[in-house]
C-alpha cells in the first residue's frame, strides 16, 4: 500500500518527534520534502537538514530545534491536501498568527514562505501553516 499524502506524513513525523522530545527525525526523501525542510531551516524552525543517499533510496534527516526545553514549532497544519487543493493569488495569501508564523507556499518560482511570495508578487498552492 502506497502512502497518499507524503507531505502530511512528513509534518506529522516532525510534530510527533517534537512532542516526544527527539533530537532528529528521519523519513523517506523527495524533492518537495527537502524544499519544505529548507524553508523551515531558513525560518529558524529546525536546526539542520541532511539527505543521505543509500543504494536505491534517499533518507531525509531533520534535526529539531528546542528553546528552553520547548519545541520551537508550536503548530504545524497541512492546508492543501490531495483531495482539496488550496490555491491563493498574491493578494489572498494567508497570514499566520498575524505574521508571527509562516505559510509554506508552492509557487512557480519554487517553495517559499507567504512573505517571500508576496514580495515576489506571486501566488500559489498553500501547503502548510507553521508557527
UniProtKB/Swiss-Prot annotation:
Cross-referenced PROSITE patterns: RIBOSOMAL_S8
InterPro entries associated with the record: Ribosomal_uS8, Ribosomal_uS8_CS, Ribosomal_uS8_sf
TM spans (from-to): none
Keyword Oxidoreductase: no
Signal sequence, renumbered to the chain: none
Keyword Repeat: no
Pfam families associated with the record: Ribosomal_S8
Record-level GO cellular component terms: ribonucleoprotein complex; ribosome
UniProt family annotation: Belongs to the universal ribosomal protein uS8 family.
Name used for this protein in its record: Small ribosomal subunit protein uS8
Source organism per UniProt: Acinetobacter baumannii (strain AB0057)
Organism classification: Bacteria, Pseudomonadati, Pseudomonadota, Gammaproteobacteria, Moraxellales
